Each structure stands twice: as C-alpha cells, then as structure tokens.
Amino acid sequence: FKNILPDWNINLDIVSEPIKDNLRKLALAKVLHTYGGMLLPSSFACFTDLISIYNAGVQNNCMFVGELLNRDGAGPEDKEDFCPSTKMMGCAKDCPLMKEYINFMELINATDYTDESVFIGEESLWCLERVRENRMTLIPSEILGSRDVNGKILTLEMLLGNSYIDLDDKAVGIYIPDQDILRRTAYQWFARLSAGQALSSNTMLGKYLT
C-alpha cells in the first residue's frame, strides 16, 4: 500500500492475524478515500459493467456498501440474514463519510486485538446506523445475486445444484460464498476444479458464469 498511500508506513508482512485483516481493511478504505472507486470481493462474479451501481451509490450519500449474507455471526442483534458488508463498498474521492469510517477502523485497530469485532459485527452495525440515517446507500442483495427474484437466499446447495435459479432482472452479478465452499467438506470438490472445469460443471453457478 505504501506505493499508493504516501502516509502508509505499516509492513503487513510482519503483522499477524487478526490485526492484519483489520489493517488491510483500513488501508483499502484509505485508498477509496484518496482516489474514489469501488471495492469488490474476489468471489463476486460480474455480469455487466458496474458503473451504474457506482454512480447510484455515490449520487446522494457519497458512500455505499453491499447487502450480503451474514455468515460470520455479525450484524444487528435481531439476527438478520443479511446485513451491510464492507466487503463491497465504494465512495467518491474525499468522501467525508469514508473518512469517518477510517477513523472508526483506526479506533478498532488501536483497541481490538482479537476477533471480537467480527463476532459483534461492529462494522455492520456502524454501517447500518448510517444507512438508517440516510447517510449511506445500501445496495440490495437481489442486485448483488445473493437472493433470487422472490427474495430467497441463494444457498451453496442451490448454487452448486442444477435446479434453475431465477435471479432478479437487475442483478449485476452473483456473490459466491467462497469461504463456505472451503469450510464445508461436501463442497470442497468445487474449489479443486480448474477455471474451465468450473465453467463446464453441471451446476447453476457454472451456467451463470458462462
């Protein structure tokens, strides 16, 4: 990060988890604040150009986050299936709300040396509060391919099965739960496939990726 962030002087190679993950999030937030742009998880497969999502996200509130399935025990106390996730976020250059998020992450890095922030869902709760205040835009899960057209959660069983999945017409991509694939023994076979094998597999995910 030091090549694109003049004030970044932390060597992440010598930092251990979970501090390393929080510092990486902080650095990415600073990149977005400095240059503007959009952050996507590596397991998000795009169907189309995302410029319309970016423009809609920054139009009124300057910063936006995606609504993704809560798989980490994080989020609000009412245990919503979906919650705001900074795995997918973006902003305009010099966004003041992103600066607030940076300050928030710096506080976490200064005080939290465990995985507690993941389980409590501090980031999700921070974002949710600002979404409710209409200061932050939430990109709906249907648009991000985490629910079908009827609002049903796209489970790993559905994605790696061969029954038809009816996505929303406005879906710009599909979010692949990569950590679930690695965690669940029954589906680790998919992680071992080559790119070509994954695309030609008899799965709905393979069909949507081609």
Annotate each language-model stretch with its function.
Residues 1-24, 42-210:
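Glycosyltransferase-associated regions of secretory-pathway enzymes
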Residues 25-37:
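Small-residue hinge/turn detector
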